[in-house]
């Protein structure tokens, strides 16, 4: 679907947040989230609805020491004809390939980006020097950590949301090994293209002010499938009703974008949210004619964003009720 058509559908879907109705309760939102999650998104449900964090302020803290390698290392894998996993056990990094180069989505931590991304690409027979663009979903250390490495060593262009470029530049303690230089500031609906690979940016502020989600196409034995990639999920922003309004609006916006693009594959930058690690392992058992483990269907993709939105609405309502 053309960019203009997708944006038109998205705009119509998010023209305004709901007002509280007499029947609205915290429990009604939690039940709706649990129903939508089913057995597909239990990790997301547990993180957002069962024990969401209560954040009072965003702190510019220095990164902690690197954890033991066995807590994060995992071998890279070819997942689709043109998409490769070069992430860790907990955090994802994806390489979308084309005849003219690679688009890398997210870059893990500083401490593991060398081994998982650079080393992983080489293990898969891919050349890190062919990474033309690095798209950062949001400027937290578990996703932006390897951006400077890719920029400095391979000349990759770094794409990030404007507010997250701003926070990166203002950070005093968050980048002891250096920051990526401000490069491409992403716009809503922008396409990042290398050869026959293209990623459409959907700005989804909430998790951070500059969070980016994405729509792109992968191929499964030559069959094209559309991916909806969620760029930020957890409630690690200050717990205020206006902040949850922003988050909820973005979840609805991304749900509309995914539906407009007929996305049947869901991916996230945290493996707990899309079950990437077990799904990759299950590919070894896939028989001819069986659906791809990531190809969950359009309805399931939509249900993911129902989970995130309903959990957020429950938290928002708790805040409003606590003030009454």
Region locations from a protein language model:
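Bacterial N-terminal signal peptides
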Residues: 7-16
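Metallo-beta-lactamase
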Residues: 63, 78-80, 126, 130, ...
């Amino acid at each position: 679907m053309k960019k203009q058509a997708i944006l038109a559908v998205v705009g119509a879907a998010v023209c305004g947040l709901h007002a509280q109705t007499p029947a609205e309760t915290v429990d009604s939102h939690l039940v709706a989230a649990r129903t939508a999650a089913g057995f597909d998104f239990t990790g997301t449900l547990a993180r957002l609805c069962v024990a969401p964090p209560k954040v009072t302020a965003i702190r510019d803290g220095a990164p902690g020491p690197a954890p033991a390698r066995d807590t994060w290392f995992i071998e890279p894998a070819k997942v689709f004809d043109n998409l490769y996993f070069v992430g860790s056990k907990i955090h994802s990094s994806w390489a979308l390939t084309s005849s003219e180069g690679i688009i890398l989505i997210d870059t893990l931590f500083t401490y593991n980006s060398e081994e998982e991304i650079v080393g992983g690409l080489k293990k898969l027979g891919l050349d890190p020097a062919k990474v033309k663009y690095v798209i950062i979903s949001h400027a937290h250390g578990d996703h932006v950590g390897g951006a400077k490495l890719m920029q400095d060593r391979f000349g990759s262009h770094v794409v990030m949301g404007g507010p997250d470029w701003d926070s990166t530049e203002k950070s005093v303690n968050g980048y002891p090994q250096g920051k990526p230089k401000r490069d491409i500031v992403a716009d809503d609906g922008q396409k990042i293209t290398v050869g026959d690979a293209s990623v459409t940016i959907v700005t989804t502020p909430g998790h951070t002010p500059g969070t980016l989600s994405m729509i792109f196409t992968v191929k499964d034995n030559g069959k094209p499938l559309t991916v909806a990639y969620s760029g930020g999920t957890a409630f690690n922003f200050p717990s205020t009703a206006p902040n949850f309004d922003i988050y909820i609006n973005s979840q609805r916006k991304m749900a509309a974008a995914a539906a407009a693009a007929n996305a049947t594959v869901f991916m996230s930058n945290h493996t707990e949210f899309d079950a990437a690690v077990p799904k990759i392992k299950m590919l070894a058992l896939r028989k001819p004619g069986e659906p791809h483990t990531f190809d969950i269907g359009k309805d399931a993709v939509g249900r993911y964003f129902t989970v995130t939105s309903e959990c957020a609405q429950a938290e928002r309502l708790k805040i409003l009720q606590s003030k009454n």
